[in-house]
UniProtKB/Swiss-Prot annotation:
Name assigned to this protein: tRNA uridine 5-carboxymethylaminomethyl modification enzyme MnmG
Record localization: Cytoplasm
Cofactor(s) in the UniProt record: FAD
Quaternary organization: Homodimer. Heterotetramer of two MnmE and two MnmG subunits.
MF GO annotations: flavin adenine dinucleotide binding
Function as written in the Swiss-Prot or TrEMBL entry: NAD-binding protein involved in the addition of a carboxymethylaminomethyl (cmnm) group at the wobble position (U34) of certain tRNAs, forming tRNA-cmnm(5)s(2)U34.
PANTHER family assigned to the protein according to its UniProt record, in alphabetical order: GLUCOSE INHIBITED DIVISION PROTEIN A, PROTEIN MTO1 HOMOLOG, MITOCHONDRIAL
GO BP terms, alphabetized: tRNA methylation; tRNA wobble uridine modification
Length: 610
């Protein structure tokens, strides 16, 4: 087998959202990087919905931007509708979401990656890992040659032994129209990796000209919403479009109920578990039998195509049943299908063999990111890609790994969850997964994480200075307003007390007291308002974190023998040996580990220290 005459620092397998972020970040840190993809025309392809962000997910994209990644930038360039979700709810759960042009997203990402120094993008299909039994050495390809690298990042998406289901029909594929990867699964098994099966699905695509939008509710976008942190107002570069909302009918329910046995999911042909919070339409009908109808969202796939995505109508039914189901939906009576819905099963690796840095515990220098780790979603994948790419370079440079904590980021929450919990379904980020979500708002991601991005060499000095200036402005203005007393109603109070009132906004305060309130602009002003309005809650959460950190970050030796600690419960010995947590905090979050077990472990660590 011929070996390519370059020894790379980092080889990234797969150019989906995880792979693109990993390759970009590794190259930006100065590494020589190979990004290997089976098809250059599908780089950063949005395989399912044409959207980025949402609750929890939008927070992650903002964190990626704060660290110096690229998903936010590509989303803003490709966005054809921007919205803030949960506007009427508290600031912790408000999140940006964008409809994007699928083709432009791919084009912008590929063009950007092609311009990064040190990054070589190559078409080829990874067939097997090269290793010496302890350390990864590179990758061999289906085409018959090999690439050598000091580290390898595996971001295979749904391609590992991917199996597509449409009713009773099933066939191999990584997604509809693309071949599955068969060799990598076998190779990981050879190396001792425990594999499981998960399932996801995607709805049919329809021709917009065949849809009756007049009976649907129009859903326009919002103004000044974006993913890249800015000081100024954001004006989209592309024309903006609306989505539309419709619903299923009694006929839809009857059709699905009568044909349930023909569904790949309910017919017993799918062994993988699907995402709980993105169920197929047949799953909704069965699990929510008391509901007469379900919302369906019609989302445009781009500006230069008539295809639309039917959000909420994912299914693994046969095509003839899909046809009838779609035409039973209000406004879709004459809909023309351009692509069928399907479900897909794929292999993933259990989290107990992965460090929070996303390096494998079994083969040194091998990093895993994206759906191979059991997650679902472009955003979760991209965040893991950033972490894997950064830590692959840290490995080469012999620097300590970068692992943000769950107290300071949603990315940290995800890394901790993936490596301490047993997944029984695809992992999706929600704000409810974070214990301190009021501290992890989407508006303050830059102030929380930009110092990491700058120190890693991913975030420019100019952007870092912007974040530092924002942070300083907010702190200074909070201090000044707390010492500025004015009459409000019948009493004289500091202006911070006025802004704490639920009916008073920062803009109202600025209008009412123009001589006393500094105009920080709408972006920084909104963050200032949240910091002041929720200062009591924020202070309590910060106090709680400080008290927890004393035990949270106590290190556990890598060579500890849990089976020798007889006071631990049998379940604790088994679980701790399986997951090998690095800190007491991580150990405490493993399912089945009790407070008593943690106390025993801490006593044992103190004895060993003495």
């Amino acid at each position: 087998m011929w070996t390519f005459p370059v020894d790379y620092d980092v080889i990234v397998i797969g150019a989906g959202h995880a792979g693109c972020e990993a390759a970009y970040c590794a190259a930006k840190m100065g590494a020589s990087v190979l990004l290997l993809t089976s098809n250059l025309d599908t780089v950063a392809k949005l395989s399912c919905n044409p959207a980025v962000g949402g609750i929890g997910k939008g927070h992650i994209v903002r964190e990626i931007d704060a660290l110096g990644g690229i998903m936010a930038e590509i989303t803003d360039l490709s966005g054809i509708q921007f919205r803030i979700l949960n506007q009427t709810k508290g600031p912790a759960v408000r999140a940006p979401r964008a409809q994007v042009d699928k083709q432009l997203y791919h084009i912008h990402m590929k063009r950007l990656l092609e311009q990064v120094p040190g990054l070589h993008i190559m078409q080829g299909t990874a067939e097997a890992l090269l290793d010496n039994g302890e350390k990864v050495l590179g990758v061999s390809t289906k085409e018959g040659w090999a690439y050598l690298g000091k580290t390898v990042v595996l971001s295979s998406g749904t391609f590992m032994r991917g199996l597509i289901h449409i009713g009773t029909q099933n066939f191999s594929g990584g997604r509809l129209g693309d071949a599955a990867s068969l060799g990598l699964s076998e190779d990981l098994k050879r190396l001792g990796f425990p594999l499981g099966r998960l399932k996801t699905g995607t709805p049919a695509r329809l021709l917009a000209s065949s849809i009756d939008f007049s009976v649907m509710e129009e859903q326009p976008g919002d103004h000044n919403v974006c993913f890249v942190h800015r000081n100024e107002m954001f004006v989209p570069t592309l024309p903006q479009v609306s989505c539309h909302i419709t619903h299923t009918t009694d006929q839809t329910k009857d059709l699905i109920t009568k044909n349930l046995h023909r569904s790949a999911l309910y017919g017993g042909r799918i062994e993988g578990v699907g995402p709980r919070y993105c169920p197929s339409i047949e799953d909704k009908i069965v699990k929510f039998a008391d509901k007469d109808r379900h919302h369906i969202f019609i989302e445009p796939e781009g500006l230069n195509t008539q295809e639309v995505y039917v959000n909420g109508l994912s299914t693994s039914m046969p095509f003839d049943v899909q046809y009838d189901i779609i035409r039973s939906v209000s406004g879709l009576e004459n809909a023309i299908i351009t692509r069928p819905a399907y479900a897909i099963e794929y292999d993933y690796v259990h989290g107990n063999v992965i460090f929070p840095s996303l390096e494998s515990k079994l083969i040194e220098g091998l990093f895993l990111c994206g759906q191979i780790n059991g997650t679902t979603g472009y955003e979760e994948a991209a965040a893991q890609g950033l972490i894997a790419g950064v830590n692959a370079v840290n490995k080469v440079l012999r620097h300590p790994p970068f692992v943000p904590s769950r107290q300071e980021s949603y990315i940290g929450v995800m890394l901790d969850d993936l490596t301490t919990q047993v997944l029984d379904e695809p992992y999706r980020m929600f704000t409810s997964r974070a214990e301190h979500r009021l501290l992890l708002r989407q508006d303050n991601a830059g102030m929380r994480l930009s110092h990491y991005g700058h120190s890693l060499g991913l975030l420019s000095s100019e952007r870092y200075a912007m974040f530092q200036e924002q942070k300083a402005c907010i702190e200074q203005e909070k201090e000044r307003l707390s010492k500025t007393f004015r009459k409000y109603g019948d009493t004289v109070v500091p202006l911070t007390k006025v802004l704490c009132r639920p009916e008073v906004s920062y803009q109202q305060l600025l209008t009412e007291f123009p001589a006393d309130v500094r105009d920080l602009g709408p972006v920084v002003g909104a963050s200032l308002e949240m910091e002041i309005k929720y200062s009591g809650y924020i202070s309590r959460q910060q106090t709680l974190i400080r008290s927890m950190e004393r035990s949270e970050n106590i290190s556990i030796p890598e060579d500890i023998d849990y089976h020798s600690i007889s006071a631990l419960s049998l379940e604790a010995r088994e679980k701790l040996s399986k997951f090998t947590p690095r800190t007491i905090g991580s150990a405490a979050r493993i399912s089945g580990i009790s407070v008593a077990d943690i106390q025993v472990l801490m006593v044992s660590l103190k004895k060993d220290a003495h």
